[in-house]
């Protein structure tokens, strides 16, 4: 079995934020923080993932910039107090708290499968590979990238960063402490 980091974002474009709002105010971070409400949780994975692999969920550092830009657009349009504005403000606070952190981990429960319809109108991600994830554990103390960037380089071009045995062992030690 192996491990990989899946790096997820806040909504990137206004259409994505509006879509998330219309569908119950659910961002990627909300889905993860409240994963029991979304069982079975399906998430983007490495297409070579196998059942039993460990998935580490990391909130992208750039999420703060994206959600701030969208919230600024809403404020400039005079919609700060609208339902969408309140949703954006709440998302901004959440993403500020978790950006750059591994917030949870889980296990690949079923073989990866491709899909062309991820269920959202305007997804920012391009990977068609998903898998059902179970045994999710939210970290009481999220692990900031500054704690592991000296031994793991998180991919900036894709959502998935595969970990070698040594990297995973060091990261497990951080999680355990």
Model-assigned labels for residue ranges:
Residues 1-87, 148-156, 161-177:
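Compositionally biased, charged N-terminal/linker segments
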């Amino acid at each position: 079995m192996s491990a990989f980091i899946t790096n997820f974002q806040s909504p990137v474009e206004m259409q994505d934020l509006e879509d998330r709002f219309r569908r119950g105010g659910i961002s990627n971070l909300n889905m993860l923080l409240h994963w029991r409400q979304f069982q079975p949780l399906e998430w983007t994975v490495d297409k070579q993932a196998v059942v039993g692999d460990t998935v580490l969920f990391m909130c992208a550092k750039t999420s703060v910039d994206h959600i701030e830009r969208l919230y600024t657009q809403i404020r400039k349009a005079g919609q700060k107090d609208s339902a969408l504005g309140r949703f954006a403000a709440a998302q901004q606070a959440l993403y500020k708290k978790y950006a750059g952190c591994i917030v949870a981990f889980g296990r690949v429960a079923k073989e990866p499968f491709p899909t062309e319809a991820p269920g959202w109108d305007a997804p920012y991600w391009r990977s068609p590979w998903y898998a059902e994830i179970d045994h999710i554990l939210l970290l009481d103390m999220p692990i900031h990238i500054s704690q592991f960037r000296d031994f793991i380089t998180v991919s900036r071009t894709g959502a998935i960063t595969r970990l070698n045995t040594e990297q995973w062992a060091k990261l497990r030690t951080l999680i355990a402490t």
